[in-house]
């Protein structure tokens, strides 16, 4: 199991960084596909992945991505309103086929998965975006890895025993310290070998804050699974589960990195 998880994790990291490096349409299409799969995993939890209500959500994901591709940010509020009206229209005209939880999930899923993940693409468009996008994955997966290692070594006090019994406060602190250190080392590396002019302190701060948010994202995904008594969202990634199992922290971190980069850079 560990070997499978390690190998698939290495492949995932290689694919992620190759896609980020290429950027443009490759990154756009990849994120669109990942978002659609992630939304379908969430919809499967409430059994609407193949229902008309779910199809409205998928259409919403595609429409949203093409809005940001065309840089039509001024139309996003109108998009949110139209999507809400369409979801509620399916609800009332099919009543009582769907319960309110399914309806709210159909709408929520577009925001939780697609809109949050789209900030990876939007961050890539920023000045030094190639380097900044790396922070999304560095602070998410880096914090998780450091937290796991520290937790195994010295973890004693449970962070959220009802959600994730294996996570410890000591591991969380180690994860944040590790994320900040990785951010600083990353800045030094891209300055030396990538021709960047990244601020070491700024990158460390971004990764520290991103690490906090990544833990919230991880626990939020766990809470949904606990509520519905499921172990994983899917089986797409061997040893890891589904898209939401692997990208749960990235979903929360991506928009935070974007806005911190805009504010600090």
Regions flagged by a language model, labelled:
Residues 2-209:
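Membrane-embedded alpha-helical bundles of polytopic integral membrane proteins
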Residues 141-152, 214-226:
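Short helical (or helix-break) motifs at transmembrane helix termini and adjacent helical loops
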Residues 152-153, 223-229, 251, 255-256:
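Re-entrant/interfacial helical elements at transmembrane boundaries that shape
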Residues 179-180, 246, 253-254, 262:
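Hydrophobic transmembrane alpha-helices of multi-pass small-molecule transporters
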Residues 208-216, 243-251:
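Hydrophobic transmembrane alpha-helical segments of multi-pass transport and channel proteins
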Residues 226-249:
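Interfacial loop-to-transmembrane junctions
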Residues 259-265:
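Juxtamembrane boundary at the C-terminal end of a transmembrane helix
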């Amino acid at each position: 199991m560990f070997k499978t998880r390690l190998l698939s994790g290495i492949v995932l990291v290689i694919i992620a960084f190759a896609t980020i490096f290429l950027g443009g349409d490759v990154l756009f299409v990849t994120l669109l596909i990942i978002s659609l799969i992630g939304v379908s995993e969430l919809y499967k939890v409430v059994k609407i992945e193949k229902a008309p209500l779910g199809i409205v959500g998928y259409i919403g994901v595609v429409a949203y991505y093409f809005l940001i591709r065309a840089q039509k940010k001024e139309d996003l509020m109108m998009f949110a309103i139209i999507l809400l009206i369409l979801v509620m229209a399916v609800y009332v005209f099919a009543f009582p086929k769907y319960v309110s939880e399914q309806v709210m999930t159909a709408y929520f899923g577009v925001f939780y998965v697609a809109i949050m993940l789209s900030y990876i693409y939007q961050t890539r468009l920023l000045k030094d975006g190639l380097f900044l996008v790396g922070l999304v994955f560095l602070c998410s997966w880096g914090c998780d890895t450091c937290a796991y290692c520290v937790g195994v070594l010295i973890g004693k006090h449970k962070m959220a025993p009802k959600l994730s019994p294996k996570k410890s406060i000591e591991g969380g602190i180690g994860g944040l310290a590790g994320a900040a250190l990785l951010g600083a080392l990353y800045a030094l590396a891209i300055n030396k070998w990538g021709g960047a002019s990244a601020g070491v302190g700024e990158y460390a701060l971004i990764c520290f804050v991103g690490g906090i948010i990544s833990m919230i994202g991880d626990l939020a995904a766990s809470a949904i699974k606990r509520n519905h008594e499921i172990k994983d969202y899917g089986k797409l990634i061997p040893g890891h589960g589904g898209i939401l199992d692997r990208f749960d922290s990235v979903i929360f971190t991506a928009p935070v990195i974007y806005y911190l980069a805009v504010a600090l850079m």
